[in-house]
């Protein structure tokens, strides 16, 4: 029996590791703050819901653009500099559109919005690949690296709840206009944290291919990649809807419960059980959405959904690490990140397309977010849940047991 239980090394929690973990949290939070602000402003400007979905989904494609160059860049140049410049690119992309419209009164067209999201995704992808796949691994001993990957991924996972929470708080205290500069400041905080960590100098490699799958994509993990994308599309459907502050608080609580459950409930459980239980919890959340009771929709549904996604995410991350061959740990981390973000962004983009009347333009700027409904994609979400469960139980899990290397 293979279990989830991971030993805890207290000497891993040194100052540099803390800095990089919080840099990961702040960087991803800056991106998820746009979950509310992008549809808000596009609805206010009269864009169609389909266009909103395209702009959001463009980010999920953008994260692949610079991945093939990651290995060359971190081996040819100082790896922390690559990460810092990438984070700076994210910060600039977050604030440039706000600056153009606010101070120069330049209205940006739909094509420009798509291009900016592609660029934003490209910088974010390179930043995460160099941070999670290289820098965090470099700060710990070899026997601590699985634990370091596991912990740092949880910091990024919590940003799914923290980003919209912070965005709503900024919206309530100031206005939605302030969200973009606040998100940019968070990215700059991540940049400062990475800059405070000292990395030993490594001589640049000369014979490195300009483009490669190293530190980018793990080909032998493709079945797992597809399974993760399908599951994250389900979460993306839900996150494409406007929600109250309470919903995101409960989503955060659900993620925290998943973290606790991994430590105490699944510590000695059979390997397959974690993903299956997670998918059952997601299905339960989908059935709760049929309820007309506000308590169930605002409290129980997001908690169940986050609990399911949280425990699935950690297990699939460890699957990816165990599929990696020698010197492929960074590649496995990047592949997991790509699958996670691609599925989420595609789900959000498709969610806007499936639900046509959620975001409506209003004469009152502060009331542009209206009419939360989610029955429209209950059937596709439940269908994807069933497909993901069957895929995992009959294809992915047997395949993983046959091909794992650790």
Q: How would you name each of these model-derived features?
A:
Residues 324-364:
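A late C-terminal transmembrane helix in Major Facilitator Superfamily
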Residues 272-316:
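C-terminal transmembrane helical hairpin of 12-TM major facilitator-type secondary transporters
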Residues 88-107, 280-294:
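C-terminal ends and interior cores of transmembrane alpha-helices
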Residues 5-60, 220-250, 348, 352:
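Helix-loop boundary and gating motifs at the non-cytosolic
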Residues 54-73, 249-262:
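Central cavity-lining transmembrane alpha-helices of secondary-active solute carriers
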Residues 116-155:
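Cytoplasmic helix-loop-helix junction between adjacent transmembrane helices
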Residues 25, 108-127, 296-313:
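Hydrophobic core of transmembrane alpha-helices in multi-pass small-molecule transporters
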Residues 177-196, 374-398:
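Symmetry-related core transmembrane helices of the 12-TM Major Facilitator Superfamily/SLC fold
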């Amino acid at each position: 029996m293979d279990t989830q239980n991971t030993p805890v090394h207290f000497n891993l929690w040194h100052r540099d590791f803390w800095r990089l973990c919080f840099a990961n949290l702040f960087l991803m939070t800056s991106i998820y703050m746009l979950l509310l602000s992008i549809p808000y402003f596009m609805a206010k400007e009269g864009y169609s819901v389909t266009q909103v979905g395209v702009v959001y989904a463009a980010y999920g494609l953008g994260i692949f653009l610079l991945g093939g160059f990651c290995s060359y860049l971190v081996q040819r140049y100082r790896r922390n500099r690559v990460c810092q410049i990438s984070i700076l690119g994210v910060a600039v992309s977050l604030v440039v559109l706000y600056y153009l419209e606010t101070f120069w009164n330049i209205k940006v067209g739909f094509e420009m919005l798509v291009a900016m999201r592609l660029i934003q995704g490209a910088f974010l992808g390179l930043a995460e690949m160099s941070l999670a796949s290289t820098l965090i691994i470099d700060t710990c001993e070899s026997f601590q690296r699985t634990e370091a990957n596991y912990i740092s991924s949880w910091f990024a996972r919590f940003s799914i709840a923290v980003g919209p929470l912070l965005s709503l708080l900024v919206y309530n205290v100031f206005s939605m206009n302030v969200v973009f500069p606040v998100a940019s400041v968070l990215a700059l905080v991540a940049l400062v944290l990475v800059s405070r960590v000292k990395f030993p100098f490594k001589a640049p490699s000369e014979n490195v291919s300009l483009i490669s799958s190293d530190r980018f994509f793990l080909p032998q993990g493709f079945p797992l990649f597809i399974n993760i994308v399908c599951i994250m599309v389900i979460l993306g459907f839900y996150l494409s809807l406007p929600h109250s502050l309470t919903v995101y608080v409960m989503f955060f609580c659900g993620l925290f419960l998943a973290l606790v459950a991994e430590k105490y409930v699944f510590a000695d459980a059979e390997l397959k059980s974690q993903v299956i239980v997670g998918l059952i919890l997601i299905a339960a959340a989908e059935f709760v959405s049929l309820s007309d009771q506000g308590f169930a929709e605002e409290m129980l549904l997001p908690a169940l959904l986050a609990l399911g996604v949280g425990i699935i995410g950690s297990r699939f991350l460890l699957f990816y690490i165990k599929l990696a061959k020698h010197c492929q740990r960074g590649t496995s981390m990047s592949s997991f990140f790509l699958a996670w973000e691609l599925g989420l962004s595609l789900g959000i983009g498709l969610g806007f397309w499936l639900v046509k009347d959620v975001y409506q333009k209003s004469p009152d700027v502060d009331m542009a977010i209206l009419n939360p409904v989610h029955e429209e994609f209950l059937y596709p979400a439940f269908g994807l849940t069933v497909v993901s469960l069957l895929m995992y139980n009959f294809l992915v899990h047997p395949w993983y047991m046959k091909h794992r290397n650790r």
